[in-house]
Swiss-Prot record:
ATP binds at residues 662-669. This is DNA mismatch repair protein MutS. GO terms for biological process: mismatch repair. NCBIfam families: mutS1, PRK05399.1. The gene is mutS. One of its GO terms (molecular function) is ATP binding. Pfam families: MutS_I (PF01624), MutS_II (PF05188), MutS_III (PF05192), MutS_IV (PF05190), MutS_V (PF00488). GO terms for cellular component: cytosol. The keyword Nucleotide-binding applies. PANTHER family: DNA MISMATCH REPAIR PROTEIN MSH1, MITOCHONDRIAL (PTHR11361:SF34), DNA MISMATCH REPAIR PROTEIN MUTS FAMILY MEMBER (PTHR11361). Keywords: ATP-binding, DNA damage, DNA repair, DNA-binding, Nucleotide-binding.
Amino acid sequence: MNARIDTGNEAFSAAELATAESRASATPMMEQYIEIKANNPDSLLFYRMGDFYELFFEDALEASRALGITLTKRGQHMGQDIPMCGVPVHAADDYLQKLISLGFRVAVCEQIEDPAEAKKRGAKSVVRRDVVRLVTPGTITEEKLLSPSESNYLMALTRIRGSGEALLALAWIDISTGVFRLAETEASRLLADILRIDPRELILPDTIFHDPELKPVFDVLGRTAVPQPSVLFDSASAEGRIARYFGVATLDGFGTFSRAELAAAAAAVAYVEKTQIAERPPLGKPERESAASTLFIDPATRANLELARTLSGDRNGSLLKAIDRTVTGGGARLLAERLMSPLTDPARINARLDSIGFLIDEPLLCGNLRDTLKHVPDMPRALSRLALDRGGPRDLSAIRQGLDAAGGVAVMLGKAVLPEELGQALSELQALPATLEKLLAETLAEELPLLKRDGGFLRDGANAELDEVRALRDQSRRVIAGLQLQYAEETGIRSLKIKHNNVLGYFIEVTAGNASPMTETADAKARFIHRQTMANAMRFTTTELADLESRIANAADQALTIELEAFDRMTAAVVAEAEAIKSGARALAVIDVAAGLALLAEEQAYCRPQVDGSKMFAIESGRHPVVEQALRRQAGGPFVANHCDLSPKTGDRDGAIWLLTGPNMGGKSTFLRQNALISILAQMGSFVPATSAHIGIVDRLFSRVGASDDLARGRSTFMVEMVETAAILNQASDRSLVILDEIGRGTATFDGLSIAWAAVEHLHEANRCRGLFATHFHELTVLSEKLGRLSNATMRVKEWDGDVIFLHEVGPGAADRSYGIQVARLAGLPASVVARARDVLTRLEDADRKNPASQLIDDLPLFQVAVRREETARGASKVEEALKAMSLDDMTPREAMDALYDLKKKLK
């Protein structure tokens, strides 16, 4: 009997178990376990024993803590108790889900022979077992373990060095849908590309994993990054490995790939082969992505804008949640993919917009399509499970239902003149095999079991031999009912019943008090053979009942054999059409996304953006797509729409920059974010929340909005702000869109103002990008006098009877106040503190009026023409003395500027 033991006990590690001494002292069963565990040291080993998967030693300690299950012991090994825990086989998926979500990897070890076969090899022979599958976060296919709306990518990263340069490449595979893509990348954008694709598991050579230059990337990814032996990423054998997987002699028909891309793709394929053991998922041919084909969004921007999840990790409140009107799993995944990877090709963007516009103009068709799509199961994932021999009757049914719905969608679309994208989708739907749908419809029953081993999934009439066996089974049931009546009359025991269990099979049961007619005479004893006595009942059998049981058992076995053979034939027929099914499923997803975005545009009054290769950025009455919907749900009144025009001014080639000032709580951050989100929506191929929008392609989007520290990496809030700002200033191009909110606020006033001033100049003169720059440094507004493409804008307010009303409207001009004290009063600061703050503010403003910031603009040349003069020893000495005497943190902005004038005089 298993006894509970202390979960804090130490246990043998995998390395300790693998020693010769350990193996020599193990029982035959434990020796087998140790050998299998030694081959899978980085995985929890689910060791099959009857109806349970059991875990031992260190695995048991980890699993019991992670799963919250009882830790017991099973005998001893080398004088120590063996920790053990287990999970039922029928509930294994639930436990796997939790372990995978916690980042564990699991090796599933099954019995590959039954005990009877083991005994033939010797009375003490151990049943043969082996690992049939490695379950890792990036290689799962079970429906319970997957999110219907999210892809489940395995990604491989590799690096090839040559001609003084290191080329990085990524390959990513979703074995649950067959998606297979690859792309080159650079160290500077590696994290951004990984987060864009959002893999569940990233494999990489251990040499890269320990590279100091890339360590910050893997620190962010945490347990997602899994180092592997470098041999897995060998570029010399890469092409051959991929060709063998797809059964082709050459990859010439797949396209042209770099050595780094091939190495990454081959590593991903090798890892799939390693984890799936003997099975092979039906992967699509590898497709190459170009970095220039998608809008670059750096990691900080992706997080700040809360595209797929909020900063707290919640899907609710994200842009994806706000725009998702899809009704299929494939559609939801495609929508997320498009949102995370907006395009930079106007032609492809406009093709998507054409589809949405067409369905808006055809509301009846759009509604009918969505009604049909609601009944489309997840065909790609059902296909993958069937191909990997993990499927069941309901997966076959999913293929049948999907093919049937696809036929209905094709009929609807076939009656219309379609735009390009929908026309291509229709062609793929029309290419689906009608004979396969007919086969499945004529073969599968209406009500289906979860597991094929349960049988009963073939409809009556589908197989003549099966019908005969079922008739025998049904006839036997009638015979049993007749025997029960016969035995009751023969013995005079009206309560006599014929029952069945897995131990005795069929048996006669009577109460102990009524059993005498079956036990008193020799004839009765010969006829009714005693099987079992219980507290209140006795059980018997007869020769004819035993014969009938044998016939029924044989019929059931024969029926299941027939059904399993039919299942294998149907599965083979489905897998043979894998490419067509995946293409058809993708077409349904495209239609679902277009119909969902059409519905969104209609219900939220979105407009079609004009997207082209210009540098325009003109938004009329733009709104924040997430905040607007939240206000409607909360009955909080209408969202205040605002214009934004960063288009090149007359005579200029480059876009404009708005310097936005205004009060706290005035809506600056919302305005900044909404314009970034509108650009993303437009380039993903969606209508946008505005009355009109003209957007020239943005190649890179940067958003520095909000503030947070990074304590784990020893970074203060200000340091994080500066790192992110540095990335923007170093990477933004003249086609980029830059959104900056209150740069410099995290340090002393003088320092912060100086940094913000220089950043605005750099964006204008060096980056020459389109941008929105929000600030509370009102001194910066004087820059509009010297920077031709810089305009001032402000959040309007109204003062009424001592109170301030935030209008949330953007207009031209500069704010003269930030109304911070009014906000402090609204927040509940003590009245005495508010009064004192007003007094201090009045004194500071009086001092500031004596030395207006406009004087500073004449004394500070633009950074790009400023020539740093060599300081004389005498001048430098005076400046140093003056600087040492200053207390910068105690200075007001006005005092800081006065100090600048004095320092300059000392340098002359």
